[in-house]
Amino acid sequence: MPQHELRTRQLRGLAHRLGLEFQAEDTYDLPAQLADFRLFRKGSRHRASNIMRKQDELISFDARIFDYRYVKWAGNHVKRYQQTVFFLQSTQLGLPELWLRPETIMHKIGELFGRRDIDFVRFPKFSGQYRLTGEDEIFIRHHFTDEVLNYFTIEKGWSLEGIGYYLILYKKNRLFSPRDIEYFYKKGIEVFRMLADK
């Protein structure tokens, strides 16, 4: 059995065990629906698959985990990216537009040329590990409570984007194995609960 078919089969079984809906193929063109997020504007040939979904009865909570692939061209060469994405829509969220990602040496060099991010004096480890950007700094600081900052200080390597009632969480170019999907789902729910309006 080809590897992608085996993955689909394993994820279908996992979704059933967790009480999640499962759809092997994306019939709704998720990447186009999520194009407000930066991740889904990168590259070309965007494709979502193996979509697992959980909704509450009032549809005030809609969470999905899916495989996402796209390609980027560099001259005559193509680089393929794939990652597992957690997407959540909820009226309990009211997020400013924000982008959190691991900070690299290129980001630090960029700061020398005025490309600043949002740092937290009381959480230097967080500020050293992550680059947090967005237009409304005051509103972003309101949502990044001590609980959130502590969480991401311990949890390294995540990328998070938020816009209004929507958020996505992923690790760049990391396709979670079927045995790690439940862990990833729980991480997504934890982040949602921390960022939700109290």
Outline where the language-model segments fall:
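Charged, low-complexity intrinsically disordered regions
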Residues: T8-K198
